[in-house]
């Protein structure tokens, strides 16, 4: 395209007015070029006397306003063929948007009067709890949320919600399934109040999540027995009721505890009338009943008939420990003729007085109850075990020259009276050195 810029004076004739005159191209093709008479040239000089043609490059503002204001689905008026080539795509998309809005408006205009559906379940009134792993069903009544129970499947929870919705709101209630599925329930729920019907739905629900029990308050313990417990009672998380051999026994124990603390309105596994005149066992009273728990702090007094504190030794305890760990102390005077160490003196301070094949064998004199004393009888110890004295010789046992101990001297010393204690019952004799 070649532009010829010629300036034309405004005082010229009408024939010489500025215009766009596309002359035929030199090669005879279908294209053309624009010429602007800016230098005052006459169009007759070039022989260009073709009519003026106007092309609309953009849509008119009136057409755009009409499309934006009119929400109807009627298509816009057709434009001339040359102008359709330069039309942008956005008016047609605006028309499509208007059609889509008109199609969605009737469906979105109807809102549920019972609130939106649950986000965690496809059923109305059903919610999945990750903490317990169960599907729980709730219904709103008089501004309060009523718990209908926890179930293993979302389908069972949805069925419970439908029954409660029909009982609370009538046949026009929004339910999950068809109303014809509950014809048998409609005949039965007429004789029940709302509270009674809710209790029935709760009895049909699952108890605790852990275990495989279908009864409320019953779970399978890891030891293989059935555990019964109550939750949220006396300010505690749960109250332990005991272990039972059968699942039904645990369920009945839960029912008795629930009736005792919550009355006839308690949610039980079986009919509450079956527990008329039934009393909780004593074992359950000790665990569950918080009124009989004695929380007073005091020191329990010993029984004078069971303990004997007459100053005599009631038993011995023999410890085979290391000398460093031995701390046996004589706590009570044994007998006037028994010379013992002063009170508070450890026997480990004199390890040289006792020598035996078991070097860490020491005597622990301690007063123990008579009923806990083991029976002492003849015991088979090696004959080589004997208690000998080390250190300085005693005058009671004089030694001979180089031939060892004298037989007569040892026999006389054994018959002579001494300050040694009476022999301990058994094969061994213990010697306690005299106090200084």
Swiss-Prot record:
GO BP annotations listed: regulation of flower development; vegetative to reproductive phase transition of meristem
Low complexity composition bias: residue spans: 9-20
Record-linked Gene3D superfamilies: AP2/ERF domain
Localization in the cell: Nucleus
Region (Disordered): 1-123
Main location: nucleus
Highest taxon of the lineage: Eukaryota
UniProt xrefs under PROSITE patterns: AP2_ERF
GO cellular component assignments: nucleus
InterPro entries on file: AP2/ERF_dom, AP2/ERF_dom_sf, DNA-bd_dom_sf
Extent of motif Nuclear localization signal: 110-119
Keywords associated with the record: DNA-binding, Nucleus, Repeat, Transcription, Transcription regulation
Subunit structure as annotated in this protein's UniProt entry: May form homodimer. Interacts with TPR2/ASP1.
Identification of the protein by name: APETALA2-like protein 3
Organism of this sequence: Oryza sativa subsp. indica
Lineage, broadest ranks: Eukaryota, Viridiplantae, Streptophyta, Embryophyta, Tracheophyta
Designated gene of the protein: AP2-3
